[in-house]
């Protein structure tokens, strides 16, 4: 049962600015309001140029290649983890939430493409009312059927992804307003049913 349970963790960052984001305190985020004044972000380390010896399901190389391409062609996206002389290359940040809290959309690509593997990359966005532009978990639609995220079917079809991102950029406010209620359904269900603390409690109660 544990193995077949989707990964349901999140990560808000560490350090003095992370107060209130601790895992045991995360339910307070349900009532927090997030004012969004920016469009699209990406948080990906520039160091991930290889798969570090992991199997083919790992996405380090494909993710790096995609973000490199987008950083060259999509100047309307703010890229965190990448440095350069362009104003949208934001470099290193101390707290992950700096790269998602103010944004309506954020690109989220997992470390691997596997069943049930949904990491903090997805849930950090959900918890901050940021629409994930997502690729990773093979069966995410079985886990979350709501239309609160944009699912990419590939991260190697660069032109298709750029077309999607340009459409989001052009129609950002409209898309966000339409999709936010669906995102909040995921958020509510996550808090009340599908999170790690709830799962542990349910398992412990059956022992």
Which residue ranges define each predicted feature?
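Pol beta-like nucleotidyltransferase catalytic core
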Residues: 1-207
């Amino acid at each position: 049962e544990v193995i077949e349970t989707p990964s349901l963790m999140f990560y808000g960052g560490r350090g003095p600015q992370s107060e209130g984001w601790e895992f045991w305190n995360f339910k307070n985020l349900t009532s927090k309001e997030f004012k969004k004044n920016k469009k699209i972000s990406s948080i990906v380390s520039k160091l991930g140029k290889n798969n570090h010896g992991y199997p083919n399901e790992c996405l380090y190389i494909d993710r790096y290649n995609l973000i490199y391409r987008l950083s060259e062609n999509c100047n309307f996206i703010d890229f965190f983890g990448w440095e350069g002389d362009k104003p949208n290359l934001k470099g290193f940040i101390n707290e992950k939430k700096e790269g998602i809290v103010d944004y309506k959309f954020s690109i989220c690509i997992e470390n691997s493409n596997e069943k049930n593997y949904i990491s903090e990359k997805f849930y950090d966005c959900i918890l901050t009312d940021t629409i994930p532009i997502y690729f990773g978990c093979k069966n995410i639609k079985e886990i979350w059927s709501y239309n609160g995220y944009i699912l990419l079917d590939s991260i190697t079809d660069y032109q298709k992804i750029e077309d999607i991102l340009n459409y989001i950029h052009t129609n950002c406010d409209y898309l966000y307003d339409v999709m936010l209620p669906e995102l909040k359904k995921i958020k509510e269900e996550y808090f009340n049913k599908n999170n790690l603390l709830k799962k542990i409690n349910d398992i412990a109660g059956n022992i």
